[in-house]
């Protein structure tokens, strides 16, 4: 692990800007997952791709009321065994709605994978040096 001060100094030299706390936290988690690969239980999922597959189209911005409504509707139709609205009401108040919806979309993809219905978005994904397919799953 590289100390925060060193990361900030290198980023400042290379880009003229520092690195956000969020980016540093995310990088730590990505490196942790990368160290565990290859592990067939770990999938690469992008919530927007999951929502696109659920809805059959690209949805409006997740930062807009229309986009939030469409995501809730898509989740409710795709996961009929879950009361999505009731589940969202149990989320901590400080968690942004778009983060909660993204977590649900990731859950939808994980369930599809567990049921053998998930699919990669690329016909021929690149394979990394460890033999892991570089592939988003929906």
Protein language model features and the residues they cover:
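RNase H-like (RuvC/DEDD) metal-dependent nuclease/polynucleotide-processing core
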Residues: 1-138
């Amino acid at each position: 692990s590289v100390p925060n001060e060193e990361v900030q100094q290198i980023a400042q030299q290379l880009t003229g800007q520092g690195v956000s706390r969020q980016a540093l936290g995310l990088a730590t988690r990505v490196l942790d997952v990368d160290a565990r690969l290859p592990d067939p239980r770990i999938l690469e999922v992008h919530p927007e791709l999951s929502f696109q597959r659920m809805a059959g189209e690209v949805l409006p911005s997740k930062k807009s009321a229309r986009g939030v409504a469409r995501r809730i509707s898509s989740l409710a139709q795709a996961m009929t065994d879950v009361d999505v609205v009731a589940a969202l009401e149990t989320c901590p108040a400080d968690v942004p709605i778009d983060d909660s919806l993204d977590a649900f979309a990731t859950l939808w993809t994980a369930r599809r994978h567990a049921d053998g219905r998930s699919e990669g978005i690329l016909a021929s994904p690149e394979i990394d040096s460890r033999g892991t397919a570089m592939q988003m799953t929906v």
